[in-house]
Amino acid sequence: MPESSFDVVSKADRQEVDNALNQTAKKIAQRFDFKDTGAQIRWSGDLGVEIRANSADRTLAVLDVFKEMLIKRGVSLKFLDVGEPKPSGKEFRLAVTIKQGIPTETARRLITLIKDEGPRGVHAQIQGDQLRVSSKKKDDLQAVIALLKAKDLDIALQFTNYR
């Protein structure tokens, strides 16, 4: 009997994040409490978001609006790595990084979790920034998916390539 497998990945949907960013920019342009604060949000590189405003609490308020839009778009907040508001001239900047991939240390913890608490005969291996889980029984793979969904991890997981 051939082995079945699936991949465990941690990738934010870039298009949904972009939509949330555009909605946030539109909302802060319309809201009265952001008037004359110089508040703006934009992409900074491929996976970075930069928030600017004339005070630290206005940058955090824009961040709250951005988080609200991400939740509405179905993107987990576990993808965000938020820095501290830093003064830069007459304004404050806040750097937000979108985390992609499963770090090696977290992947090792997931493997030990699967070996300790998962069904017997399930094998997990690290492949770059993702995890491949394989077994001869599809029911065991579904049990592993349920196990990983039940655990409160510090990263958001998706299950892809189910064969």
From Swiss-Prot:
The keyword Nucleotide-binding applies. Disulfide bonds: none annotated. GO terms for cellular component: cytosol. GO terms for molecular function: nucleotide binding. Keywords: Nucleotide-binding. Pfam families: DUF520. The keyword ATP-binding does not apply. It comes from the Bacteria. Nucleotide-binding protein. PANTHER family: UPF0234 PROTEIN YAJQ (PTHR30476:SF0). Belongs to the YajQ family. This is Nucleotide-binding protein Acel_0286. It comes from Acidothermus cellulolyticus (strain ATCC 43068 / DSM 8971 / 11B).
